[in-house]
């Protein structure tokens, strides 16, 4: 699939999210109207209010929704009541306001549980050719999550350089090493102030990854998680990908952090730096351990030295900036 069709798919995901949001808003209106009916059964009133109070919480909305659905189904069944004969005569359908609204709730039962929306993509899409779409989705301030698998290169189309490609890395269209630094997508997203942002790396800190995913899912707004993802184009043994991820974080090549706007609302610093002080003595060894960098040193040793130094300086400057903002 080409990048333009991928961007179109992600825009459709947002449209789907907006459609679900509108349908759930209509469902909430029906529930409010239902529990406002004087003769509505107490069980439905109680379950309906519980669902309204928790409709934006994934787990709680599911539990409350099941109670409300059961109460509505029981409420429209008039077996054993004084209205049973007329109810049966009418095809087991009561046309009163309460029963009519209860049936509408039952018809929309698939909307009772809050839906989780995740958009997945690579760095070529998120940083580069589809960035306009990513930015548009984040700017809408909708409850949608984006997970970017950052390989720092266009992996699916043959290894072309992207705006995520760091200084000195060899890729198609950058055969002599990329001369500009990596785009800081996370910082750009944070500038909105209302976007949850996290930079993660699975094997380097699994707990931080899970915490970021959990916080992003719980946050009632847009979320962006950027995950370091080793790729065959890096020129490494992919069986050792998890070890390579840890090396990247340990030496400071990849910085772990979480930016949670909810903390700012509590008067706290929204940025949490999860990376430890980088072991910079291992930085150049990390670069030279990957073919995407090592091949540049073989072909253009003089150029490579300067670009590798700039790569390290860029990474350490980024860490220092995030450390300062987190203090």
What is each PLM-predicted segment?
Residues 9-77:
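Aromatic-anchored, charged helix-turn/loop surface patch used as a conserved interaction hotspot
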Residues 19, 126, 174-181, 200-208, ...:
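Catalytic cores of large soluble enzymes that bind and process phosphate-bearing ligands
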Residues 28, 100-103, 135, 183-190, ...:
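Predominant activation on well-ordered alpha-helical scaffold segments within soluble catalytic domains
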Residues 77-105:
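Amphipathic alpha-helical binding modules
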Residues 93-98, 124-136:
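Conserved phosphate/anionic-ligand binding catalytic regions in large, soluble enzymes, centered on
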Residues 106-115, 242-327:
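Conserved acidic/glycine
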Residues 113-118, 128-143, 149-277:
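Glycine-rich ThDP/TPP pyrophosphate-binding loop and its adjacent helix/strand module
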